[in-house]
Amino acid sequence: MTAAKAMRKERTVPEQLQLERYNLAHSSVEANIETDAFEQSHADRIDESARNASDAESQQNNSDESPRQPIRAAVAKAAQLARGAEAHARERQHAKGKNTARERLDLLFDTGTFQEVGRFAGGDINQGVAGCAVITGFGEVYGRKVGVYAQDFSVKGGTLGKAEGEKICHLMDMAMSLKVPVVALIDSGGARIQEGVAALSQYGRIFKKTCEASGLIPQLSLILGPCAGGAVYCPALTDVIIMTKEHSNMFVTGPDVVKAATGEVISMDELGGGLVHNAVSGVAHYLGEDEADAIDYARTILAYLPSSCDAQPPAFAYAATRGEREMASRLADIVPENDRQPYDMLEVIRCIADYGEFVQVQELYAASAVVGFACIGGHPVGIVANQPNVLAGILDVNSSEKVARFVRLCDAFNLPVITLVDTPGYKPGSDQEHAGIIRRGAKVIYAYANAQVPLITVVLRKAFGGAYIVMGSKAIGADVNLALAFQPDCCAGSARSREHNSSQGSAKGQGTWSGC
């Protein structure tokens, strides 16, 4: 039975019951009239009964419509208020160079697939409020169901109160039950101070729900406006954070508080703008040119990920072209024979990825390591690689954190990890030791050693010292380990170089070695 038929059936049953009650009452009145007709002394009572019957009949007819009329009127009024609010929101948001919450939903989902949940929850038509400051619902991204909650800055500054918190938590529960991803569109002034601790407690509930969903379903956050105070931990707990060059801000304490507490004068963008969190702090994973670019990136990431940890990543039809086969054969030409000569690892990745397509993650952060998604033979994979073009592909505090975080994400959602190794080791220096290189390096080991997905490691030129062990080595659990072979003359030349360097080093009390 379709939902429409079920609704029609539910509406029909009460109408039948009301009709039966009406017939019963009407027949009872007629029986009384017939009985009283034999008693002439009670003529006045007959007239009174007739009048009462007439009134009852009129009241019964009115009662058939009375339960529905107020509801219909309320829904119509709420819809009218919603249309007016959307027009007002469009005017305000466009003046700031931003889209409305509903316009963002149109960009995120396949056309015509969004279905809202709890549209009028938290509203008060008597006060002229159609709904609360968050929109929740489900739609489709490339044909697969995805949940969303979008904060509406045009309603009370997008602040979070009891109604908003309950809607978000309900959406999270539904998404976990359905095992579908959740996308958060953040544009909020934080907790609604008028509601006091009750508003703050809603953040606690959202934190808990986000942690419960972590590793179960993919969670993406798009920062499309302000996100300050405790609210920043909502996106920080998700898998991927996307920001824009303008209007995106994240910070625990804002510029005014910083100035009052420390005397430092700093702008919102300098404190926690999109560029800062993509290139400096490493909090975010992508910096969009604008909202449309950021949302398109989110759609792309969702295309590589499964709907939940219980599902496999989607497979894509693929047939290698002649040009791609020729590109793959150029791999040995891209990697220089001299192990100290830099090259662009992205060229290597494009040689092995379907159609040469590679979606980088955290492109601007810790550039000596490269991570991202690609397809090989139509199957999505995660790729981790050293970047010889930046600091010779060395591992440091930030790149270790970047690699570990990405490997854990791939492992959570069943994506095989391909590791392309070309690194001279860990970056030396007191700054690295003081910043916790031991702790961060251990995270990389933990990520690889605990991964349950297929691990394939390819050593392109060199893998020295501790960096060799942590970068997906056989010793910590890689399933397949390969090495790119050089031409014999290259190896011979490198061997002669080692002998020459060794003899010189012996005279000086030290040796210099280079891999081939």
What are the functions of these language-model segments?
Residues 2-516:
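Ligand-binding clefts of soluble mixed alpha/beta catalytic domains
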